[in-house]
Structures are given as C-alpha cells and as structure tokens.
C-alpha cells in the first residue's frame, strides 16, 4: 500500500512502541463491565473499513509476545478524505450509559513535508443504535456523532528517531441507550492515526455485604448525576431492624454511597464479620436488639446452639414478668421465729424474714387460718368473718393482727413467704405454723336500748343481752351524762338485770345514756348513744316558797344545806365501799340485784386503797390477796435476790387446776416486823390490780415460813436487760406493741388512782409472748435533801433520770409525773436498753432538764414516737398527755404502720438534743479525721475518705444507711458514730440559730 511504501519506518516504529508500551495498559477496574476490548482480541478484529483502502488492520506483539490487533490510517497526501472504520455489533446488556476509551497516536502534520493543505490532526467518533446486526454496509447517515477527537500530544519524525511515542487516551460517554446494541464508527478526514486500542464498557456497583445486608450488582443510572437506590437483603439468620430497612445508593461512577439502615442478627445468633453465627451451648440471645450472646443466667442452661432463652434448672423458675437475663429463682423458705400474742379473741403474729428468699426481692407473706378440733385431729379453713389487719395476703411487713376469732377455740395459723415464682412451683409449701387457743372474749355490744318511762327526775331503761355474750354476764354498766357536758363528767349505774331506773336527774334536761356488759373477760363496747329529755317541772310554787323563806331566814338555808351535804357524803363513802366490793375487791360474792350509783370525774369503777391506811397489815393483805397453802407451791430454783430475800421460780398447783409457772418472793430469815410489813405491803397493792399488762398476784403465804408472795412467772425478765440482750432484733411495730402494753397497764393504774412513782424499764417484766407488764409496787420511797436528788429505799438508791422535774423539786407525784417516766421508758425501749442521759451526773441531768434540753431520738426511732416522748416531757404537767391518750396514739400507729416509717426531722416542734458538758464541741474540729479521733473511731478514717466525706458538713447530713454503706458492720460502732453525728448536727443548728429548746 502507498502508506506502507511511502512511510514504512513509521509503521515499524509504531510496532516497537506497541511492544514497549503495551505493559502500561491499566488493569480492568473492579466497577467496570467490558463490552469490547480490542487488546484482548488475539485474532483479527475484522472490523468494516470503508473505503477498503482507508483504515488498515495490523498486528503486533506485546511484551509477552501476545498478538495485538490495531488499525491505522495515514491518507494525508490527498484532500477530502472520508475513511470510515466500524466495529462489529456490540450488545449493551443491562447498560444505560456506555463509556468508550480510545488509545491512539497521531502524527504532527508539521512533521510531514508537503501535506500542509491536506493533513488533519483530528478524527470523529460516531455510534449507531440497533437491536441486531445490520450487516457489513455502513449507512453513514444513520450514525450519530459522539465527538471530534483531537490528540493532546502528536509525535514527529524526531520522536521516531528517538524511539519516543506519545500515546493519547480519550474517554467519551454514550447514552442513555434504548436499543439492545450499537456500533461504533471512526471517521478519518485526513489524519495520520494509529488506533492502539478501543475499549467499550459500562459501570456498575459490585455486590457487597454491608451491615449484614447483601446488596447485589447494580448498574449505574442513565444520567451522570443519577443515584440508584438499592434495598439490601439480610444475610442468613438476620432480620431488618425495625423501621430501618437496609438501603444503599449506587452512584454514576459505580460506587456505593453511605449505607442507610441495617440488618441485625436474629434471637439466638450473633454477628461475626458479615455473617450471623448461632450462640453456643450455655449461651443465649433473647432478642435481635442484643448485640452479643450472653452466658446463661444462674440456675439456667441451654443445651443446643442458637438458643433464644435458657431453660431453668429443676426446682427453679422464671416468672412471666421476669426478663430472660435474670437468674432463675425458687420460692422462699419458710418464715423464721414466728411468735404470737393472744389478747382474748385477737391474735397478733410476728415473724422474721425467711433465711432464703429464693433469689428474689419481691417476697410477701400470706396467712392461712384454720380452726381445729384437736380431739378429732381435723382442721377446716376459717370463715370469711375473720378480720386481718392490715390484710391476709400480699403482706409486705412481717406482722399481722387476726381479729374476730371465736372465744375458747383452737386455731392454727400458717404463715407462708411467697415470691413471684411461688405459684409456678410444684413443690410442697413451706410455712411456719403456730397453734393457739383463744381466751374468753369480752361481750359484744348491747343492743335494743329503749326508754320505758320518763319522769321529771328519773328515767327507766331496758335493753337486750349482747348477741355474743362470750361468757356469763355478771353485770351491766349504764353511763349517763348531761348532753351539754359532752362527757366531761359522767355517772355510772350498775345492775345485773336488763333494765334499770336512773334517779336523781334534773328536770327539763337532755341526758345521754350508754350501756355495756361485763364478763370475766372485761367490759364490752358501749351501746349507741340514747338521748332522753326529762320532763319539765310541773309548777314553780315550790321554788317560789323556797325563795321567800330564803330571803326571810338565810341561816336556815345554810343549816339545811350543811345537813344535806353531810348525809350525801355519808352515802358516797358507803357507796364507795359497797361498789369496791361489788367490783371484785372482796373475796365474798354479793347477794341480790341491788343497783349502785357512783359519780366520778374520770372513767373506771375501781379505786386504789393505800394499805398504809390499815393499822393491821395482815388485815390489808387478806383483804386484797388470796392466802395459799404452802403445799401447793414447789420451789425449783433461785433466780435472783430481792430487797427482802431470794426470788425463786417454781410451780403452783391449786386443787382442780393445772399447775402454772410462778415467781416466788421469799422473806429472809430474821426479818423485823417493819420488814414483814413492807414485804406484805407490795402484795396488798398488787392484789388490787387485775389487768393483762400488770403483773398478776397469785396469792401469799403468811401462815407459814418462809413468808411468800407468789406472782405470775415472766420468762424474759426485766425489760431493760431483755432489750440489751436482743439489741436490734425487733421490728419497730414490735417495740411499739411493747410500749402499748406498758401504756395500757399504766392507764389502768391511773384510772384506779394509783401513782407508780418508779416507772422504768427495769420495773417492766416481759413474758414469753413479749407481753410487757408493770411491776415493782412495794418500794417505800422518801426523797431526801440530797444534791444528787435520788430516791432512798431500803434496797438502794434509784436515779432521778426517770423522775419528773416537779417530783424532784416539790415532791409532787401524780399520774402526770408517771407520764414523764413513761416517756423515759419509751426512750429506753427504742434505744434497746441504753442508760438515759448516758454517763452524765444526776446534777447535770437536772440542770439540763431545767434549761429545756431533752433526750434526742434514738437511732432509727420514727419521728412520731420521738414527738410523743417530747410530749411526755413537757415542763408543765398539765400539758402532758394522759395515759388514755397515749394508748390511743399508739393504737393508731399500730393500725397504720406507715406512720412509723416517717423519717426523723418531720416533727412539728424542733428541739435541741440534750448535750453533755463533757461532750466535745464538734464545730471546733477542722477535719473529719480529728472528729473520728475524738470519738475513738479513727479506724474508719479511710472509709469516710474513700466515700467522699471530706468535710464535717457532709458528715452532719449522713443517715444510718450512709454509715452502714461505709462497711461499718459493728452495731455498737454504728450507734456511736450516728449518735455523735446527731450531736454534731444539733451543735451546728444551734450555732446557726436554728435549734430551740422545749
């Protein structure tokens, strides 16, 4: 050919260049899909050239001696060249945009002599869309021009000589395409060109796994700026995240953009790389939201791979509300230390939490009541008429009161601790049980009270017996008062029948009547109020006559009044004596159904009689105490020493009765007559009392030796020692129950007019059921002019710490001074037997009380109880509560246990705690360490520092829970530190002017 014959060296050099530069071709990009690559064609390309002598296909070898097919044209000598080269038909596949990459060389026209008018340095690129191969004809008019291609660099003859070749690369886009395929065409218009390679491809985003979602191969969009959204498919054992399906966008460049949404491994599977693998044995994953498999919780297992939950071991369960990550649990063990207290037909049960709560914190208690016939050995569930306070099931506290039981009946109570899995367990129930026999109940309320006859000065009443007498009714008590008086003062009438006539009333006055029945178990409740108005005076003549005579002779009126007063006084004294015997003080029963009238300012029917008023002590003791036969008494052992001799325990066996445990006080040998008199005086006092919270006198032995006083045996001894022995072992409600019993006993004594004068925890005895009873009635007390101000007794001195200020200063003993002492007893009980005022001297105690200081609240003492103590310690005795009020307050606390959870600091009247003069001034310390050293607790300095308590201000705000959280486990140390903190807090309040005295 002309081209080859005229410029053979150029062609040869072109081959050399191909061999030299073939290795510089870039590798196929991972995001490109080839449709045509001329370099990959080892055989002839056989493209169509028109005219045939235009473009020429030639061969060469690359560096690997692989044949390479190229086309060249160099028709530069003649003008108006129109040489076409067309590829074979190219199927576009799924492509919408096509990329054409051309690599070529182009000769610089200036380097060719004689071709300045005919040589070109560009060529044109065309394409033609079609659904099939149209054959070998090139229909130029159907082709669409893509672009005119110009070389960035052209080579010269010199480049050939230096073996330098300048390769041009141009890339053009086609699209969007709508047919199945297309042709490419190259138009030469007179250039000297060599097409080294032609590559046709389209771009797509290759399949990837991202966020556990598979995104398939995706062809790019038809436009340069288009984004193709692709929704991913979750890998095996994965699922789409809720409302966040996996999506990605494929860009026009074949690149995946930032993923949106994701897949997550299903329950039982966890992610490992781009896959979800099953949880191994002993592991689980309960939710797809969890990231990793977790080891099975305690007492559970999984025996297969891919577990979404772990099964509980035998005997362990999971409540429906329990999440799968918590340990399997079991029902709790039985409650511990179940104790009971019987008050006629009411039983109080208390217990300690179970030793094993089953691994749960939702332990509650339920009570099962059974009425039993022990002779037949059968028990049946109690009926619905039984009352439970606060409730029968779902109890969160460890106490309950069961009410409305039948009298003289046998009951068994089962207390079961339950938790969230108790109902799932098939095991036998675990419970604590106690069997009891109720006592005699007081009668129920009197009903059907009616007025039978109403006159000017009398009213006749009738009524019906109580529906449940619960024993033999021995008498009825009618209480009446003027309605305007509102029960400030009232009168009582007693009768054995169900009717009575009330005399000596005022004409034209409205009276209120109430009636209650009495049995050996005590009084029942009063009937509803009945208002009755007496008739008006028929005429006023009598009063007029009296008025006239009074004006004429007032001396006569005075004499008449004096005589009448004397007669009334005689009748009142006689009535008191008869009434006392009728109420049970006399050992002989009264005959007849006579009605007795009394008028009192205070409730009650018994009056205490001082044995000292009897000239003969034997007469007093036999008046009030029962003489026992010494043969009925068996002394077993000595348990202590009393003021007059030994105190022993033993048994009392009376004819026809079972033996009972008793305590026996003996009068020592060689006693004086005064000692015998004082010894029997206590029996004369005790014999007048009959109350569940006052120690009961069984009787005396005066006709033999040794002289003995026999009282009921109290198993737990004195209250103060008992509390110290069991420090911290009782609930607040148990302690309040003890206080309530003491207050009830003192209310009874106060109603009888007896002043104890030595009420202290050491003089309170405790039985096996934790019932507290007032004791110690036999001391002779004389206050001496002692600067220490103590009682002097034949047995020793009693500190003034329990005594009211007016009793110390003025020797004025009343029930109000007993109330003061009761407040100290409350403090002793709540502090578990601590000594009141600690190590202060008696003189310091008296001075502090005079200055208005009072004992601070014991540790963990509810605010309401401390407030009651402060009320008992009012300086003005008239402002102190009565024992009747104290019992009512404590009853309300027991009925509403939540009131006992009120934290300290909510009292309506703030106080400053009593401060010992020897107590260090904590406000002068500079550091927590100095304070701890002052109270000899420096061993805990590191504990306070580690917990962040670096200032005394922060320490002053600490609670007992804060102290315990420091790891201080010794109860004594906890109390000492907390007491010091309370004192520090009081000093700080006083320093800033916020603390006040009572």
From Swiss-Prot:
A Gene Ontology BP annotation from the UniProt entry: regulation of postsynapse organization
Domain (Fibronectin type-III): residue spans on this chain: 331-441, 442-537
Designated gene of the protein: EPHA7
Family to which this protein belongs: Belongs to the protein kinase superfamily. Tyr protein kinase family. Ephrin receptor subfamily.
Ranges of residues in domain Protein kinase: 633-894
Keywords from the UniProt entry: Apoptosis, ATP-binding, Cell membrane, Developmental protein, Glycoprotein, Kinase, Membrane, Neurogenesis, Nucleotide-binding, Phosphoprotein, Receptor, Repeat, Signal, Transferase, Transmembrane, Transmembrane helix, Tyrosine-protein kinase
Intervals, Extracellular compartment: 28-555
Cytoplasmic domain ranges by topology: 577-998
Residues annotated as domain SAM: 923-987
Summary of subunit composition and partner proteins: Heterotetramer upon binding of the ligand. The heterotetramer is composed of an ephrin dimer and a receptor dimer. Oligomerization is probably required to induce biological responses. Interacts (via PDZ-binding motif) with GRIP1 and PICK1 (via PDZ domain).
Xref: CDD domains: EphR_LBD_A7 (cd10485), FN3 (cd00063), PTKc_EphR_A (cd05066), SAM_EPH-A7 (cd09548), TNFRSF (cd00185)
Protein residues bound to ATP: 639-647, 665
Residues the record marks as carrying a glycan: 343, 410
Cellular location(s): Cell membrane
Pfam families: EphA2_TM, Ephrin_lbd, Ephrin_rec_like, fn3, PK_Tyr_Ser-Thr, SAM_1
Highest taxon listed in the record's lineage: Eukaryota
EC class (word): transferase
Presence of keyword Signal: yes
Statement: the UniProt record of this protein carries the keyword Kinase: yes
Protein name per the record: Ephrin type-A receptor 7
Gene Ontology CC entries for this record: dendrite; glutamatergic synapse; hippocampal mossy fiber to CA3 synapse; neuromuscular junction; neuronal cell body; plasma membrane; postsynaptic density membrane; Schaffer collateral - CA1 synapse
The protein's role, per its UniProt record: Receptor tyrosine kinase which binds promiscuously GPI-anchored ephrin-A family ligands residing on adjacent cells, leading to contact-dependent bidirectional signaling into neighboring cells. The signaling pathway downstream of the receptor is referred to as forward signaling while the signaling pathway downstream of the ephrin ligand is referred to as reverse signaling. Among GPI-anchored ephrin-A ligands, EFNA5 is a cognate/functional ligand for EPHA7 and their interaction regulates brain development modulating cell-cell adhesion and repulsion.
């Amino acid at each position: 050919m002309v081209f080859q014959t005229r410029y053979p060296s150029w062609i040869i050099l072109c081959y050399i260049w191909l061999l030299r530069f073939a290795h510089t071709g870039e590798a196929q990009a991972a995001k490109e899909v080839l449709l045509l690559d001329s370099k990959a064609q080892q055989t002839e390309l056989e493209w169509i050239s028109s005219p045939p002598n235009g473009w020429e296909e030639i061969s060469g070898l690359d560096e690997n001696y692989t044949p390479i097919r190229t086309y060249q044209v160099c028709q530069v000598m003649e003008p108006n060249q129109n040489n076409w080269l067309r590829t074979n038909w190219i199927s576009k596949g799924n492509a919408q945009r096509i990329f054409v990459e051309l690599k070529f060389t182009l000769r610089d026209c200036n380097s060719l002599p004689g071709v300045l008018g005919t040589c070109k340095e560009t060529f044109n690129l065309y394409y033609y869309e079609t659904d099939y191969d149209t054959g070998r004809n090139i229909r130029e008019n159907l082709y669409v021009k893509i672009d005119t291609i110009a070389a960035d660099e052209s080579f010269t003859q010199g480049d050939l000589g230096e073996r330098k070749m300048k390769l041009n690369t141009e890339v053009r886009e086609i699209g969007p395409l709508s047919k199945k395929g297309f042709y490419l065409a190259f138009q030469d218009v007179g250039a000297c060109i060599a097409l080294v390679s032609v590559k046709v491809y389209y771009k797509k985003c290759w399949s990837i796994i991202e966020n556990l979602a598979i995104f398939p191969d995706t062809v790019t969009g038809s436009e340069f700026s288009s984004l193709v959204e692709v929704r991913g498919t979750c890998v095996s054992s994965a699922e789409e995240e809720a409302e966040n399906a996996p999506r990605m966008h494929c860009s026009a460049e074949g690149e995946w953009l930032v993923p949106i949404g994701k897949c997550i491994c299903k329950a039982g599977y966890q992610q490992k790389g781009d896959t979800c693998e099953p949880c191994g044995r002993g592991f689980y994953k309960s939710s797809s939201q969890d990231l990793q498999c977790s080891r099975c919780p305690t007492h559970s297992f999984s025996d297969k791979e891919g577990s979404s939950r772990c099964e509980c071991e035998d005997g362990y369960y999971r409540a429906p509300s329990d999440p799968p990550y918590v340990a399997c649990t079991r029902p709790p063990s039985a409650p511990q230390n179940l104790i009971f207290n019987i008050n006629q037909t009411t039983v109080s049960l208390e217990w300690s939490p179970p030793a094993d709560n089953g691994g749960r914190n939702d332990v509650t208690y339920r009570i099962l009541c059974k009425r039993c016939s022990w002779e037949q050995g059968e028990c049946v569930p109690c009926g619905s008429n039984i009352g439970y306070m606060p409730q029968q099931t779902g109890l969160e506290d460890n106490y309950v009161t069961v009410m409305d039981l039948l009298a003289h009946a046998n009951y068994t109570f089962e207390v079961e601790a339950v938790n969230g899995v108790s109902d799932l367990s098939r095991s036998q129930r675990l419970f604590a049980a106690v069997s009891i026999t109720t006592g005699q109940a007081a009668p129920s309320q009197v009903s059907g009270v009616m007025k039978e006859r109403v006159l000017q000065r009398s009213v006749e009443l009738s009524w019906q017996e109580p529906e449940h007498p619960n024993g033999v009714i021995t008498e009825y008590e009618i209480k009446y008062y003027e309605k305007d008086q509102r029960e400030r003062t009232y009168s009582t009438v007693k009768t054995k029948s169900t009717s009575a006539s009330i005399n000596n009333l005022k004409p034209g006055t409205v009276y209120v009547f109430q009636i209650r029945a009495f049995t050996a178990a005590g009084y029942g409740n009063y009937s509803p109020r009945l208002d009755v108005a007496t008739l008006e005076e028929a005429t006023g003549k009598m009063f007029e006559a009296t008025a006239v005579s009074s004006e004429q002779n007032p001396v006569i009126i005075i004499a008449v009044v004096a005589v009448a007063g004397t007669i009334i006084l005689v009748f009142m004294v006689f009535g008191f004596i008869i009434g006392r015997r009728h109420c049970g003080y006399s050992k002989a029963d009264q005959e007849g159904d006579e009605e007795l009238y009394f008028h009192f300012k205070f409730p009650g029917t018994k009056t205490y009689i001082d044995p000292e008023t009897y000239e003969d002590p034997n007469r007093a003791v036999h008046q009030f105490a029962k003489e026992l036969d010494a043969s009925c008494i068996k002394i077993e052992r000595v348990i202590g020493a009393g003021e007059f001799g030994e105190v022993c325990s033993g048994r009392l066996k009376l004819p026809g009765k079972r033996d009972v445990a008793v305590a026996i006080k003996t009068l020592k040998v060689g006693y004086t007559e005064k000692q015998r008199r004082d010894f029997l005086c206590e029996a004369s006092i005790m014999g007048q009392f009959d109350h569940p919270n006052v120690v009961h006198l069984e009787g005396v032995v005066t006709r033999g030796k040794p002289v003995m006083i026999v009282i009921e045996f109290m198993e737990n001894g004195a209250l103060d020692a008992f509390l110290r022995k069991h420090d911290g072992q009782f609930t607040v409600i148990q302690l309040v129950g003890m206080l309530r019993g003491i207050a009830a006993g003192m209310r009874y004594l106060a109603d009888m007019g007896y002043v104890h004068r030595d009420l202290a925890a050491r003089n309170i005895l405790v039985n096996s059921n934790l019932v507290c009873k007032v004791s110690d009635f036999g001391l002779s007390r004389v206050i001496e002019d002692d600067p220490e101000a103590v009682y002097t007794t034949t047995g020793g001195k009693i500190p003034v710490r329990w005594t009211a200020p007016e009793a110390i200063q003025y020797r004025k003993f009343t029930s109000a001074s007993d109330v003061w002492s009761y407040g100290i007893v409350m403090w002793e009980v709540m502090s578990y037997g601590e000594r009141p005022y600690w190590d202060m001297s008696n003189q310091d105690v008296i001075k502090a009380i005079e200055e208005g200081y009072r004992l601070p609240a014991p540790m963990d003492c509810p605010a309401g109880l401390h407030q009651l103590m402060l009320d008992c310690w009012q300086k003005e005795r008239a402002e102190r509560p009565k024992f009747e009020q104290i019992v009512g307050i404590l009853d309300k606390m027991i009925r509403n246990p939540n009131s006992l959870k009120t934290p300290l600091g909510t009292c309506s009247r703030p106080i400053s705690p009593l401060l010992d003069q020897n107590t260090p001034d904590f406000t002068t310390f500079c550091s927590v360490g100095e304070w701890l050293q002052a109270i000899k607790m420096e061993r805990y300095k590191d504990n306070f520092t580690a917990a962040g308590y670096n200032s005394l201000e922060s320490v002053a705000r600490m609670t007992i829970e804060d102290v315990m959280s420091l790891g201080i486990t010794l109860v004594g140390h906890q109390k000492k530190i907390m007491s010091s903190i309370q004192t520090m807090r009081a000093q700080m309040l006083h320093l800033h002017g916020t603390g006040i005295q009572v």
